[in-house]
């Protein structure tokens, strides 16, 4: 029996988070060809809206869906925005590493928070077509755009990159692109019309984001345009501290172990919202500290 136990123990190994999602892609919203396309569009558009709003830029987003192989349901998705762009050295982490992001530890309202979404799109595209995702990024301080093909090593949760370089990025009218991001990816998915469709998602997105201009080109070449109806950006979202009522006991224990505060009252005031000096004293008196 001990030999069997040792053999079973030797077969156990830690699984990378990206390898887990590769085998359980339905957890990321890629559970059917129709929903997979909507999920990919949502993740890319959410990233564009968040980036533009954080940089205080009125969003202009272009989405294009093309059918490359109708028999195999291979679709190409292109999403372009006028956001601040991503520095070249950060592209591979943003697109090729799960749980990489700037908002995971911050308590604030935002569309993307877990650092999974767009990397999940890269992974699903690679899984279903074997092709990397092409990224083009231009930041305002540079004259040319960075371009790179991004894949994902699921065993290491690390990006693989190829064809990296720089190029001039111009609009269709020949004007230079000042800043922005373009993501081009191919995946096994289906485009459909109606309620559960990319068109419907983008239409609803334009309604709840009146400050955004969204243009969608469908597989038939028809262009759908939702213009910006206000020049006013939403108020800037600030991070807040947690409230004592909203955390679990284990979280409190971890915060206490990591704190450098010498007094519990100081810890309460500096780490939580809604805790004044008076409230901290009342709380400590109730628990006899």
Please provide the spans of the model-predicted regions.
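A short glycine-centered beta->alpha linker in the GHKL/HATPase_c
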Residues: 85-87
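Short beta-strand/loop element within the Bergerat-fold HATPase_c
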Residues: 60-70
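Short, highly conserved beta-strand within the GHKL-type HATPase_c fold
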Residues: 70-78
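Acidic ATP/Mg2+-coordinating residue in the GHKL
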Residues: 81
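Conserved short strand/loop->alpha-helix "switch" segment adjacent to the catalytic nucleotide/phosphoryl-transfer site
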Residues: 20-42
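GHKL-type ATPase core
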Residues: 4-5, 76, 89-90, 101-246
